[in-house]
């Protein structure tokens, strides 16, 4: 698309930020933590919106304010939790590509109605890899949060783009965000040990649960909002340690249930009552301590259909992005006549480059 350029992002205010990707998809086969972005959908969408592979490295922010300065014009996208996004004080939109001019500061503040924000950058973000992924592994001590003044390097092949109208997004591509409301509808399928819980299974399906303060990337601890009893096993046989999937809803002794997330070990010895679907896991990746959760039983077929719809939407957005980038390549081609080049919309037109007609 253009001559490669090297960009440097200086981290001015790191908060809790790190390099992240979608994780080690084959890690469980060799006993390795899968890791990766807890909100896989938002991370994949951030990369898709800037025409990067969905599994490419990006920056993940957790809860705290973040700021960085670039020395090169960049195309970026900010997805995930609701936040205030500004470039040199000018408000910017989430879930759309943003032009980040050289010498300006990007600030992402007041992260709310969700926990994690993802910053995708068009180009190749340099990152150390372990078993094919840059995802941090806290057990092995791989990966670390950014420090103030640290520099993140990006190789960019996108041509320099001029966008004089900061009040409008350069593209409007119709990416659908999560519904952030502090109350999460989480679909689950039956776990391998559900029969051992008898009628107490209804204590999971029919009540609201609250996310506990000790929840993290390894798993979420939840208790009932009314402090009522949780499901319990009706049998007394010993449970041997065995492989458990990401999303396993375990029931240890006590008054909390445990949902294993992407930082979990590959084996565990608690009974597995249910398994959160892939779509539900991305939602749980945004659940804050104090948020409430309602579990909704679904069939395996429904869980697969939900995931396919989400993947189809990512594919549709990717197609729109490729169309927009093809137009940009034509616009910047020295062999194309200026009279036949695509024209940018004027500031009075509420549609922008790349916006499908059905979205306006």
Q: What is the role of each PLM region?
A:
Residues 1-360:
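Conserved "landmark" site that anchors the functional core of diverse proteins
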